[in-house]
């Protein structure tokens, strides 16, 4: 019986019907059952920043943040994925039926994102999230063979004043687990083992890292070709994954009775582990055995974690007075447990957009195998010696919402 169930766990196929059911979901707002953080409390923001190794006091010290231009603590850009309550409470039954079971039981691998930031998320904010499936495309899969389905989700976050804080597009690639698993044995990936000398080099690298912080980086002082300070992440350990989960959370991963209740609601989210016990399918991030069954030789990191690394690279460079307007990244390869990454970037463009003094950055994350696993671009708005503080960008007006207390 358990063997039959394990076969079902990896045997789901991408079919024409499944693709059409997925397309039926486009534009339908999806309610969130329960955010990890309903409120952006001081502790929630701090714990999120710490979960990926960010020591910026703007995200962790109310006393420090009170003396910045923000007059209080703000959240790192990707904190929003831990929060956001839904206005829509359910999908109409006739709409739900059209998309029922769409591509259930196949991989959904995080492949990249575009993040646009318009307002800071402040301590004690209660955000609303509006999430829809934005697009569905069918492509050939180099990862698993056969076809894959690329879907993009759009998440819009609004504060209690109805202002858009963040628009986030996330790309997922859906592949068949069994096909991907069959190719796993053909992939040769050397797992990292480090010497004491290398560990000392890592310690020295961490000791040398600096943060711009309270010293403004003025637009006039930046030149095309300037290099960003390198930032080290790793070697990645299972403890790092635990730390990430502590701060970023997943409301679906619950123990005991709560886990049982969630399994009744979302049975396809669970597969049998090596002990014959149902466990969350996302354990590929800490369970080598399950990772191999879905097409990866080893357990690997979360895409959102690497996105947070990129945000830290940018915030360390721009300082407290800068504003990251846009971040676009790709996740081209897994970051396995044991991997080490160096993040870096260069200034590729300076320009003026209305009242905003902008800088464009090429950024990347490169592992110990000299693979760029996550390239990207960022647009930063900087303060100006001549024109004053960085001016925040305007969100698309059609996404702003009027609140009852607006008058």
Predicted feature locations:
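Short low-polarity hydrophobic stretches
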Residues: 48, 77, 345-347, 370
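Residues in well-ordered beta-strands of folded domains
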Residues: 81-82, 116, 171-173, 231, ...
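Flexible glycine-rich active-site/ligand-binding loops centered on an Asp-His dyad
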Residues: 145-158, 168-189, 379-384
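A structural microfeature
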Residues: 165-168, 229, 374
């Amino acid at each position: 019986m358990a063997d039959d169930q394990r076969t079902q766990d990896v045997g789901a196929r991408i079919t024409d019907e499944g693709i059409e059911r997925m397309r039926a979901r486009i534009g339908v707002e999806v309610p969130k059952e329960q955010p990890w953080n309903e409120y952006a409390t001081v502790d929630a923001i701090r714990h999120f920043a710490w979960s990926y190794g960010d020591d910026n006091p703007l995200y962790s010290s109310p006393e420090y943040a009170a003396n910045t231009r923000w007059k209080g603590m703000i959240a790192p850009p990707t904190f929003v994925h831990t929060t956001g309550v839904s206005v829509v409470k359910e999908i109409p039954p006739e709409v739900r039926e059209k998309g029922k079971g769409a591509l259930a039981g196949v991989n959904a691998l995080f492949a990249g994102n575009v993040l646009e930031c318009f307002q800071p998320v402040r301590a004690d904010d209660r955000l609303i999230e509006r999430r829809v499936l934005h697009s569905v495309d069918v492509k050939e899969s180099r990862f698993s063979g056969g076809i894959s389905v690329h879907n993009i989700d759009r998440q819009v976050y609004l504060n209690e004043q109805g202002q858009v804080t963040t628009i986030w597009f996330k790309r997922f690639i859906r592949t068949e687990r069994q096909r991907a698993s069959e190719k796993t044995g053909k992939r040769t990936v050397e797992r990292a083992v480090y010497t004491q000398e290398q560990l000392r080099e890592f310690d020295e690298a961490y000791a040398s890292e600096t943060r711009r912080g309270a010293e403004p980086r003025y637009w006039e002082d930046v030149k095309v070709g300037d290099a960003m300070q390198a930032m080290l992440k790793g070697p990645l350990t299972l403890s790092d994954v635990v730390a990430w989960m502590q701060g970023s959370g997943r409301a679906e991963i619950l123990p005991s009775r709560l886990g049982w209740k969630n399994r009744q609601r979302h049975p396809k989210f669970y597969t049998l582990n090596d002990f014959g016990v149902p466990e969350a399918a996302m354990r590929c991030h800490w369970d080598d055995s399950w990772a191999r069954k879905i097409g990866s030789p080893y357990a690997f990191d979360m895409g959102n974690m690497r996105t947070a690394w990129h945000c830290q690279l940018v915030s360390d460079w721009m300082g407290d007075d800068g504003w990251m307007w846009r971040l676009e990244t790709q996740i081209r390869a897994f970051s396995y447990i044991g991997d080490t990454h160096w993040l870096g970037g260069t200034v590729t463009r300076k320009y003026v957009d209305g009242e905003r003094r902008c800088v464009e950055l090429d950024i990347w994350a490169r592992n110990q195998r000299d693979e760029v696993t996550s390239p990207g671009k960022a647009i930063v708005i900087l303060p100006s010696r001549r024109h004053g503080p960085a001016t925040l960008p305007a969100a698309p007006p059609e996404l702003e919402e009027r609140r009852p207390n607006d008058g």
